[in-house]
């Protein structure tokens, strides 16, 4: 890619890029020689606490049930008017469905907007969901800049 170089997003640029919710790709670590399990998901982002929330479908036959305790990475990327942007977060998911109402975990959830994307052949009311949060061990963003003279 001639003429392009990457630089880090500032925290403010990262927060603006993530907004209060959108879509990205969540990847779960696996064992042995298996590739990571990657799924497109909706997310909500609470910038005040650098916390990302997910509402994941977990039907009985879901492989996610056996993977949610594994390390994860989460990626959001898209082209903006100012060029390409991406954010990568890593860490472990924490279930928040059973957290007390007054807990920081649930209070942060009320501040985000997790988009509803219907990708199933059944009505959403028939699908079990669990809510998780990610307080990233690492949260970085990059942006494209024009390096032409």
Can you describe what each PLM-predicted range is?
Residues 57, 68-79, 84-94:
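Active-site-adjacent structural patch at catalytic or cofactor/ligand-binding sites
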Residues 63-67:
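Surface-exposed connector loops and short turns at secondary-structure junctions
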């Amino acid at each position: 890619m001639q003429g392009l170089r990457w630089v880090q997003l500032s925290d403010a640029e990262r927060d603006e890029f993530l907004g209060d919710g959108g879509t990205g790709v969540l990847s779960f670590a696996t064992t042995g020689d298996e590739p990571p399990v990657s799924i497109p998901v909706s997310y909500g982002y609470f910038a005040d606490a650098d916390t990302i929330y997910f509402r994941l479908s977990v039907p009985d036959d879901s492989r996610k049930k056996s993977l949610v305790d594994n390390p994860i990475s989460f990626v959001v990327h898209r082209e903006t008017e100012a060029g390409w942007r991406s954010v990568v977060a890593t860490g472990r998911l924490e279930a928040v469905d059973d957290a007390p109402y007054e807990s920081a975990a649930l209070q942060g959830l009320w501040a985000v907007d997790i988009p509803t994307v219907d990708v199933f052949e059944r009505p959403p009311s028939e699908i079990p969901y669990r809510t998780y949060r990610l307080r990233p061990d690492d949260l970085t963003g990059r942006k494209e800049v024009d390096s032409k003279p």
